[in-house]
Amino acid sequence: EWWPDFCNYRRSLFPYPEAGSIEETILDILRCEGSLITRELRAACGFTGPRMRSRFDAYLTRLEMGGYIVTEDFIYPLDRHGREYGWGWSLLTTPERLFGRKACHPDRSPQESRERMLTQFQKILPHESEKTYAALLK
């Protein structure tokens, strides 16, 4: 229910990546492949050398903050008995693929989306300060 407004508002704070940028390449690969675990996406983008992981993670973080990529699921490695173990690997995709294009492009301005979310926060958290609401919407 709240994703369209969240996405609309966040994308207004984080503009679409510039043409030819690494962020745009990441989005293009995800659009072509559908969804990939982080490790596969990193390799597909050529970030395979030493110290490349943290640089790549910074690009992913910016795209996630802007609502351009989301975690669809977590994939767990299997042991020799076929049982899941360890930490899950994030399966990344675009929200357009996961929720549909309409859910990412509502028929209202980013400011209207912000106001809707602010009203909801004020309803469910009535005793919080304006500073808290601002932090939640940041």
Predicted regions and their residues:
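Long, low-complexity intrinsically disordered regions
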Residues: 1-138
